[in-house]
A protein has these predicted regions:
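Dynamic helix-loop-helix/coil hinge segments at AAA+ ATPase domain boundaries and subdomain interfaces
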Residues: 4-5, 44-68
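C-terminal alpha-helical "lid" subdomain
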Residues: 225-287
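Conserved catalytic/switch belt of AAA+ P-loop NTPases
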Residues: 107-108, 136-137, 154-200
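Conserved AAA+ ATPase "SRH/arginine-finger" region at the nucleotide-binding site
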Residues: 183, 199-212, 219-233
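Walker A/P-loop nucleotide-binding motif
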Residues: 79-101
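Interdomain "pre-motor" coupling segment immediately N-terminal to P-loop NTPase/helicase cores
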Residues: 2-47
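Pre-Walker A adenine-sensing motif
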Residues: 64-78
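AAA+/P-loop NTPase substrate/partner-engagement loops
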Residues: 105-143, 150-155
């Protein structure tokens, strides 16, 4: 066997061994970023240069929710007891925005460099136990683990990974990690799925209880609801003032209401989309 052939065989063997026992996962550049995204396919925790968020003061109509989540997060940052939180409710009402804004506010108020925001996608939730194990190794840091739009459909068993991770098993949940999830469903399961379980299970009450109890793993339930017209207009006005968008007050009100009617909803998201529209028309930069 010539030397080149031997080297090719050895390289293939090395590659095969690496696939069987991949290198230990780690987080690069922890000090260089405030936010990260977990990528299941590569196993990397990728740093985000700029987190897409707005200041906490711009979030209107959710005063109780802001206080609850801020107090819980500041406790976590200060090594005090804190709960995992489920932010549930209507679409576009500021659930994920609140998590990101609270993270920023806590960083500003504590001057901490060690509180990091890590997002895990809903479809990667089965990797949660492994991710928690990885984060637990970085004891100098604290991690807010965010899963946006979390829910489970019929036939899915990944919710069991979430239950196990939140309970912590015999190892316990890492003290340096807190889990925040947003969802449109209070119990994370569609009602028809739970009703179907009730009708087909050998022991209906136990089967449904297992799924409903998933939300019980969150010590905090923070509800978000559809907003009033006045609150919707307050949100619009706050953005317009913040970004100095030139527009007549009467025109602003009329156009904002027309926008919400055409969208069939009033929410923080709809307000933001309207503001982006009028900012573009007036050639006003908002970032």
């Amino acid at each position: 066997m010539d030397e080149q052939k031997r080297d090719e065989i050895l390289e293939r063997i090395a590659n095969a061994l690496e696939r069987m026992a991949p290198p230990e996962k780690k987080i690069d550049n922890l000090d260089g970023s405030e936010g990260f995204i977990y990528e299941a396919k590569t196993g990397l925790i990728r740093p985000i240069n700029i987190i897409n968020r707005i200041s906490l003061g711009l979030l209107q109509g959710i005063v109780p929710q802001k206080k609850i989540l801020y107090d819980n997060t500041i406790n976590f940052s200060n090594d005090l007891p804190a709960n995992n939180a489920l932010l549930w409710g209507a679409r576009g009402t500021g659930k994920s925005s609140l998590v990101k804004s609270v993270h920023e506010e806590v960083l500003l108020n504590t001057k901490s460099k060690y509180l990091k925001l890590v997002e895990i996608h809903r479809e990667d939730i089965s990797d949660l136990p492994e991710l928690l194990s990885l984060l637990s190794k970085y004891k100098k840091y604290k991690f807010i683990l965010l899963c946006d739009d979390l829910s489970f459909d019929a036939g899915e068993n990944t919710y069991k990974s979430l239950k196990a991770a939140l309970d912590g098993g015999i190892e316990g949940k890492p003290n340096n990690v807190i889990f925040y999830a947003t969802s449109n469903r209070r119990h994370l399961m569609p009602r028809d799925m739970m009703e179907n379980e009730r009708s087909t299970a050998i022991n209906p009450s136990e089967s449904v209880e297992e799924k409903v109890s998933l939300s019980d793993r969150f010590g905090l339930w923070v509800g978000f609801h559809n907003i009033s017209q006045d609150t919707y207009l307050d949100i619009v006005n706050a953005y317009v003032k913040k970004f100095n968008i030139p527009i007549n007050k009467k025109s602003l009100r009329a156009e904002a209401l027309e926008w919400s009617i055409t969208r069939g909803a009033r929410s923080g998201r709809v307000a933001w989309q309207f503001v982006q529209d009028i900012a573009g028309k007036s050639k006003t930069k908002i970032f």
